[in-house]
A protein has these predicted regions:
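Residue-level signature of the transmembrane alpha-helical core
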Residues: 16-20, 47-51, 73, 77-81, ...
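Hydrophobic alpha-helical transmembrane segments
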Residues: 75-119
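Alpha-helical transmembrane segments of multi-pass membrane proteins
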Residues: 17-25, 36-59
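Juxtamembrane helix-boundary/capping and inter-helix hinge elements in multi-pass membrane proteins
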Residues: 2-10, 68, 163-169
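Transmembrane helical elements of multi-pass membrane transporters/channels
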Residues: 101-122, 129-170
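Membrane-interface junctions at transmembrane-helix termini in multi-pass inner-membrane proteins
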Residues: 4, 54-74
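Membrane-water interface segments that mark the loop-to-transmembrane alpha-helix transition
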Residues: 1-33
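Juxtamembrane "helix-exit" motif on the non-cytosolic side of transmembrane helices
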Residues: 29-37, 85-92
Length: 170
């Protein structure tokens, strides 16, 4: 951000809004066509969880760039502690309760991360889309990010789609 600390939080907010719209749209399409046999509550919780986890991904990248590794670890410890606690508390509501506990815990994790970013980079402005300007777009970072994430997820896809290691749960 070229030493302009005041532009970090508005850019983060803009990116988060953009990401929520994109992941929300993708989630609605998937929810509509692929989980029709599940309850409406289950589908809404899956949508909320997908959007919140996508937000967490962005917040983690921001905090990593700020070299706030201990804060990231503490945020995840609190968030996942809440996830387990809420899931245990809501388990009488079956799958929807467990999923609701997961989403609540992830939301707490996200809020904690956003507070850390806000505390480190306060701003007078709420939102900006400077990251979308052509001069701020770097294709090399797009490809590095794509292949890094592809590598992280490749083994998961292999396990999910290789029949001997996967089985339908729902």
């Amino acid at each position: 951000f070229g030493g302009k600390d005041e532009s970090i939080m508005p850019a983060f907010d803009g990116l988060l809004l953009y990401q929520m719209l994109v992941s929300g749209a993708i989630g609605i399409v998937v929810m509509t066509f692929f989980f029709t046999e599940q309850s409406v509550m289950y589908r809404l919780l899956m949508l909320a969880g997908f959007v919140v986890m996508s937000d967490i991904w962005i917040a983690t990248i921001f905090l990593s760039g700020m070299k706030q590794y201990k804060a990231i670890l503490n945020s995840f410890a609190v968030g996942y502690g809440c996830t387990v606690g809420f899931a245990l508390l809501l388990r009488p509501f079956n799958l929807e309760g467990l999923l609701g506990g997961f989403v609540l815990g992830q939301f707490i994790l996200l809020i904690g991360m956003v507070i850390l970013i806000l505390r480190n980079y306060p701003s007078r402005y709420f939102i900006a889309f400077d990251f979308a300007k052509k001069k701020m777009f770097f294709w090399s970072l797009v490809w590095v990010g794509f292949f890094y994430n592809f590598g992280l997820w490749l083994d998961k896809f292999m396990f999910w789609f290789y029949l001997p290691t996967s089985q339908p749960i729902i």
